[in-house]
Amino acid sequence: MAQSLNKTVELHTTGVSYMAIGGKVGKFLIGDMALEFYPDVNVEQYIQIPWTSITQIGANVSGKRVSRHFEILTDKSKFLFASKDSGKILKIAREHLGNEKVVKLPTLIQTISARIKSLFAKKS
């Protein structure tokens, strides 16, 4: 049986985890100790990410609008999630992690232009 790491829950919302081919719909539990995701199909395939192991969390921002998708980087892996409440999740993460670990991810155009620039950059 799944055992939560959190003692108190600050936000409970629905979302999608993109860990394999196709997404898994489930519930987010964001609390005092960790960010947790429990799939609706099989709760035993849960994802628990303690705040201490997160190195960076970010989402795409255009204007003042935060995208539904957000990315979590840990010491060992990278997780991709989507939620209608991604802005609320990032605000709670900022309280636990600090401003330096919550970042604005580059847009698709910025990523493509950076790769093109790196192709034509002088190599010494």
Give residue ranges: language-model regions:
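Anionic N-terminal interaction surfaces
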Residues: 1-30, 47, 84, 100, ...
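Canonical phosphoinositide-binding patch of PH/PH-like domains
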Residues: 72-95
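Short, surface-exposed secondary-structure junctions/capping segments
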Residues: 62-70, 95-111
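Generic hydrophobic, helix-prone segments enriched in Leu/Val/Ile
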Residues: 9, 15-16, 37, 89, ...
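Phosphoinositide-binding peripheral membrane targeting modules
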Residues: 17-71, 75
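Charged/polar, solvent-exposed surface patches and flexible loops
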Residues: 56, 91-95, 114, 118
